[in-house]
Structure formats: structure tokens, C-alpha cells
Amino acid sequence: MNALSEHILSELRRLLSEMSDGGSVGPSVYDTAQALRFHGNVTGRQDAYAWLIAQQQADGGWGSADFPLFRHAPTWAALLALQRADPLPGAADAVQTATRFLQRQPDPYAHAVPEDAPIGAELILPQFCGEAASLLGGVAFPRHPALLPLRQACLVKLGAVAMLPSGHPLLHSWEAWGTSPTTACPDDDGSIGISPAATAAWRAQAVTRGSTPQVGRADAYLQMASRATRSGIEGVFPNVWPINVFEPCWSLYTLHLAGLFAHPALAEAVRVIVAQLDARLGVHGLGPALHFAADADDTAVALCVLHLAGRDPAVDALRHFEIGELFVTFPGERNASVSTNIHALHALRLLGKPAAGASAYVEANRNPHGLWDNEKWHVSWLYPTAHAVAALAQGKPQWRDERALAALLQAQRDDGGWGAGRGSTFEETAYALFALHVMDGSEEATGRRRIAQVVARALEWMLARHAAHGLPQTPLWIGKELYCPTRVVRVAELAGLWLALRWGRRVLAEGAGAAP
């Protein structure tokens, strides 16, 4: 077991040292399909089309059947991409089964917009409906009526602006509203809104206008973004890229949750990332990428990380996202984010600042079991729950929450793991362990023994599934569809396994009468 712990630390060190390449994000059905639609040449992208067809589920849709709300955008996009690729093997059949799938699916936007709707749904889905109606007339597709007024209001707002500033959040969905390349300009990485789909759409329009230098920058960006998926297939893209602030911030924050932030084996890799974050954090905060708009979520996590590293960051960068008692992720946000306020609370507590409003909001957003499950950036309740427990317990050594603890223990599956879908996942099991790690500290001996038994079962499940340098495959993060920020998830998996191993050693030591 000690050898495994060393291997874990070695892999973590390698992952941290690789974080200067813009980030690693798994492949996206939505962005790949959109890029294929805008590429024009079907025969030049046969491998990408084959990959797209291979991702279709048995029921005809794309995306996980466990989380139906996030299947519409990838299914619409794939359907529209494949209906123009009829000669390719499997394309016609895929279109037929996708059409039947969309006809059968209940419309989640028939009457209202769910709190955890995918990014850009109000712009993207009505656009797809219109395109499908003109291409596949006579088919009774869902119409998503609750999104129409939101799209119209957004288009009116956009119509009043000649060009959005680089990095504006709405550029991330440019493919759904951009009608001229003059309404956007590639950022310093060559992207439109850190979105391969938006960039591919913009590039297709710019080519017809002869904007050669900027088209070259967009091409270079798309090549780099495709490489970030590690799929090895030209024309397969991630849902978002780069993530050169989000990836290092969340990775170091995760190390803290596992008690690994200050581990000597990781010290140099952590120091390099902290120095970069410190240099990048300005008065306006940070966004998920260097050339994207600042938001409260990335800013709050960056403040946490910098404070944990012994820096003294100014809280002002976070305060200007505060509206009344809440923190908005970014100005004009459709609905407040629970995890953004959890991270703001954690940052304020670490920095010793008043946080009554954020604390009250986090407490008020529990479900009846005392957990947090109404999150808009991650589909699993285990993600906000782990972070909320850490934030609420910060600076309060005697903090206890028996209701949340009981619910967390009860949610462990028979196989020893945790998961919000039909099966356990390594990532979600790690989040459960991070929460239990905090809760264990204030428990009496009986409670600690009970937690230790649960952790032992989790460790057994993790050991049976651990592979060195494995690539996480399960998309649980909410973008335009569910996606997987590969390194962020891998750091969580490894940190969770390391924590469970250390827990097991401590329990053995305590059983032998030694000090923990």
C-alpha cells in the first residue's frame, strides 16, 4: 500500500507539471458535431464522423441516459451533422434512430426552464428547432417553448451591440446567434469564447469574407483544442478549451480537500502553479481561462488556493460579484449557483471576512436529507456536498452535521462506491471521501469507527478499479452538454484513493494502540 501511495503522488506530480498546456478535456459530441457541420467537406473528416456515430446510445440519443436533461443539445447537433453525411456507413440509420428518439423524449422546456439547464440552452436549442424544421419538415420534434422568450430577449440585447468584447460569456455560444464574423474577434489563443463550436462557426463565416490572418489563428486554436481531447482523431473537439485557470485552481483545491495541499512530494509543482495564479489574479478576478471573462466561482477558488499557499490575496476581486446577500457567477446570470456561493463562503472564511449572506444561502439550499443537489455546474450532488461541508466547517473545529453525515453514509452503494447515476464512479466516490474526511474530525470514537468501515468498503471498490495513468471517461460536468475535464477529475480520483489508503493505515495504527 505504501508503494501505491508513492505511485499516486508521482502521478499527481506529473499531472500538476503538465498544466501549462491549456488543459485536458474529454471529447464532446456537441462540439464535434457542430464543427463537422461548419467544416463543409464530409470526406475529409470521416474518422470524426465515425467517432460521432459510435457515441450514439442504443435508444437513438447521444449523452448519458442517466441525465436526460443534457441529451438534447448533443442529439440535435449530431442529427443535423449526420443528415448531410448520408453516404457514410451508418449515418442514415443514425439519423433515423435519432429522429425517433427526439420525437419520443419529453420536452424539459415545455413549461419552464430547469435550474440546472445546460449552458446556452436558451440560445442553442431554439436554433436547432428552427434548423430541423426547415431540413426535416413534417417531423414532430420538441419545440422547447419556455426557451423562446429567453432567446428573443438575448438577441435583442445582442442586437444593440456591434461587437462583444473578447472573452464575453455570450461568445461561448456564438454559433447559436452569430450572423457575421464582425460581431466577434478571436482572442489571443485564437478562440471565440473558449468554444470549439463557436470558433468553428465563426471560422466558416470568416472564410467567406476573406479574413485570412484571423482564420489562420482560429485554425491553430482548433488544432490545439482537438489535441486536448487526447482522442487522436482529427476533428474531434472538447466542449470548452482552454481551461488554463480552472484546471490548476480546481486541482489544487481538491488537494486541499484530501489533505494533500502541503505534501512535500508535491511542493514544487504546487509552488509553480501558485506563482502563476498569484501573477494572474487582478482586481477583476479570474475566469476559467486567461482570455475569458472573470467570474465569482474561479475567483473564489483562486483566493482559497492562494491563501492556503500562504499568500495574502485581496478579497475585493470577489466582492464585486456580490449582489445583496448572494454572489453571482457573472453579471446577468440566469439563476444563482449553489457551488459559486459555496466557494465564495469558503474563500471568505479562509480570509477571515464576514460571510453571513453566503453562509445562509448555502444552508438554505440543502435538500430534505441535508445534502446539496441543485447544482448548475456539475450533475452530481456529491460535488457540491463535498465542497459545502469543507466550506461550512472552515474555521469551526467542532462543526458537526449529523443529518448530512447520515445521508452520505446511507448513499453508499452496495458495491462500496457512490454515484448520482445508475452506477458508482471514481470521481463521485472521491467527493464522498472528502466530505467524510472533514466530518470524521469532530466525531466521537463510535462515529469514527462507523465512518472507517464505510471508507474501507470504498477503498476496496477503488482498488479494484484503479489503473495507473488512467483516463477518466464519465462526463459529469455541466457545459452545453455533460463533459469531463480530464485532469481535474483524475486529480480528484487519485486524491480520493490516497486519502482512503491513508485512512486505512491510520485505523490499523489506532487498532494497534499507536498514535494516529
Curated annotation (Swiss-Prot):
GO terms for biological process: terpenoid biosynthetic process. InterPro entries: Terpene_synthase-like, Terpenoid_cyclase/PrenylTrfase. Keywords: Repeat. PFTB repeats lie at residues 45-86, 401-443. One of its GO terms (molecular function) is terpene synthase activity. Coiled coil: none annotated. This is Uncharacterized protein blr2149. It comes from Bradyrhizobium diazoefficiens (strain JCM 10833 / BCRC 13528 / IAM 13628 / NBRC 14792 / USDA 110).
